[in-house]
Swiss-Prot record:
Listed pathway(s): Carbohydrate degradation; glycolysis; pyruvate from D-glyceraldehyde 3-phosphate: step 2/5
This protein's name: Phosphoglycerate kinase
Binding site for ATP: 212, 301, 332, 361-364
An annotated GO BP: glycolytic process
Domain of life where this protein originates: Bacteria
Length: 405
């Protein structure tokens, strides 16, 4: 990788500004899942072990009013980080000003400080100004001035956004480096796109064609096979003229689905049967229906069926690179999670056979965690939108702003 990384920096005695992604689920001050905090630990520990003084920036949720600030302080996140590091994390409930500046100047080597939620800058005195999320140049410059001309970006999850806390700071320091997590994401996702070991199979699931259409188009040019599942598959079924009952589909995307199928030929792999249910409920009456026979009126497809699972297993059997983003069914209901879980199990086999397996997106990640196989796959991406855009081959502002070696 030709980008500057944290290992290239001289950190001792330096105030090191770091952008991390601590946008964790939080309710009433209780963190639902701390995976993103854990993911940033190697870079933070490296800075501290090398006698750097770590100053952490992250956003949390969306701030649209002063009231949102009461619910979305990073204070509980700083406390959890302290537990994970086994050391005190100084938390400053400000995003600028004297209190923040003096706390940073008082930091000693090997100490860590967390700045308040960067998106507090999106609402100032009750007015929505979006200083952080619209990358206000004055704010990026100010935050950059708080450190010693060093910046580490370890927040891949926000790399597709140009914010003051990633691009803004990076543009105002002489050395902007990738943290270990960012470096890993760039390596695995970058290799999958630029130089995959073949056969390369992409699996794209989820509800809407409109959300994933660009990635499907892009991957059809790069992968040997593209498997499409989840709710979006019914738009393709409708395009084939199959009956889809009450299944989710996008009428305005049917023509596009026809075009894609015509262009892709047998490169595009679609489900051949479904688990259809008479209600959107885990205890609904269900039946297995072949796609060609169609889903009866009053029923909706909520998962791929057993023949589709077998088809996907066969498609993946000799794969050497697999990228998976999005569920095959309504994964949050146990009766419609089988297709998604079967993919997770198949990916373990691919990895055991020497293949590279990359998983991105919340539901796919949840599936491999539920199966307990996350550590048996090559890479679990921390970015949803960011990983999709990177796989599409787009330049991500958060990565583009990291210095070249």
């Amino acid at each position: 990788m030709a980008k500057l990384t944290v290992s290239d920096l001289e950190l001792s005695g330096k105030k090191v500004l770091m952008r991390v992604d601590f946008n964790v689920p939080i309710k009433a001050g209780v963190i639902g899942n701390d995976n993103r905090i854990v993911a940033a630990l190697p870079t933070i520990k490296y800075v501290l072990e090398n006698n750097g003084r770590a100053i952490l920036f992250s956003h949390l949720g969306r701030i649209k009013s002063e009231d949102d600030k009461k619910e979305l302080s990073l204070a509980p996140v700083a406390a959890r980080l302290g537990e994970l590091l086994g050391k005190d994390v100084k938390f400053v409930p400000q995003t600028r000003g004297e209190e923040l500046e003096s706390a940073i100047n008082a930091l000693q080597d090997g100490e860590v400080l967390m700045v308040e939620n960067t998106r507090f800058e999106d609402v100032v005195d009750g007015e929505v100004v979006k200083n952080e999320s619209k990358n206000n140049p004055e704010l990026g410059k100010y935050w950059a001035s708080l450190g010693d001309d060093l910046f580490i970006n370890d927040a891949f999850g926000t790399a597709h956004r140009a914010h003051a806390s990633n691009v803004g700071i990076a543009s105002n320091v002489s050395q902007a480096a990738a943290g270990f997590l960012m470096e890993k994401e760039i390596k695995f996702l970058g290799d999958a796109v630029a130089n995959p070991v073949r056969p390369f199979v992409a699996i794209i699931g989820g509800a809407k064609v409109s959300d994933k259409i660009e990635i499907v188009k892009s991957l059809l040019n790069k992968a040997d096979k593209v498997i499409v599942g989840g709710g979006m598959a019914y738009t393709f079924d409708a395009a084939k003229g199959n009956k889809i009952g009450n299944s989710l589909f996008e009428a305005d995307k049917v023509e596009l689905a026809k075009e894609l199928m015509a262009e892709a030929g047998d490169k595009l792999v679609l489900p051949i049967d479904s688990i259809a249910a008479d209600a959107f409920s885990n205890d609904a009456k269900t039946e297995v229906v072949d796609a060609e026979d169609g889903i009866p009126d009053g029923y909706m497809g909520l998962d791929i069926g057993p023949k589709s699972v077998k088809l996907l297993q066969d498609t993946l059997s000799d794969a050497k690179t697999v990228v998976w983003n999005g569920p095959m069914g309504v994964f949050e209901m146990s009766n419609f999670a089988k297709g998604t879980l079967a993919i997770g199990e198949e990916l373990v086999k691919v990895t055991e056979n020497g293949g590279t397996t990359i998983v991105g997106g919340g539901d796919s990640t949840a599936a491999v965690q539920q199966l307990g196989v996350a550590d048996k796959l090559t890479h679990i991406s921390t970015g949803g939108g960011a990983s999709l855009e990177y796989l599409e081959g787009k330049e991500l502002p958060g990565i583009a702003s990291i210095s070249e070696k």
